[in-house]
Amino acid sequence: MSTESTQSKACCNTPAVVAKGYQPKGDYIEVDGLKTYTTGPKDAKQGILVVYDIFGYFNQTLQGADILAYTDDQKYQVFMPDFFEGEPADISWMPPDTKEKEQKMGEFFKTKAAPPKTLPRIPKIVDELSQKNGIEKWAIIGFCWGGKIVNLSSMEGTKFKVAAACHPAMVAGDDAPGITIPYIMLPSGDESKDDVKKWQDGIKVPHVVEWFPDQIHGWMAARSDLEQEKVKSAYEKGYKMVLDFFKKHMGDGAKL
């Protein structure tokens, strides 16, 4: 079990979360041939790669990227590539409570969302952005499916200094021992307690696992209903915790 404090110390200047009609602060560029959302101060020397959930670009996820970029006193350039190239999963498939929805979701995970399709692109994206944007240190965060990609991108030889997985999908104990960087996981009430426990028992690096048992799978990304005060509060808390963890393990003076 991790003994690290998960309470937020920074982020006192958190901008108000917009429940509806959010206007993203960033722009779109092309990186490794992929449309990529970019936000944050252009002179920031630290970068965060965001691996979205299977539903792609949603305002809740874009707002999260802006929060990561501008909320903390440690500034970041933040990048969210469109790994599904304009063809994400349809959010109407959730929950997969019919045979048709289940089949569509399963097919998506076997094809476009198959990790071997995405994983090789990540080092290329980081290298290209490091060269073009002068970024010296990197963190990675992923949501749902993106959490699996983050886990598999945090092994030996990783280009990242610290990682975060929010309401991660496909949590597997076998993935934990190979992680080589500090790692924060924020499971929702929909994740398997057994799977997360096996994963936590296997991880050998500094880590935090903080449950949000009253939140659904997706509360920090596309499925977040920010018009509900309880969800909005958990959304804010989750991003604050991630930023604190990143700062602790990536900021000036961090011991890695």
Each model region followed by its residue ranges:
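N-terminal cap/leader regions of alpha/beta-hydrolase-fold enzymes
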Residues: 1-256
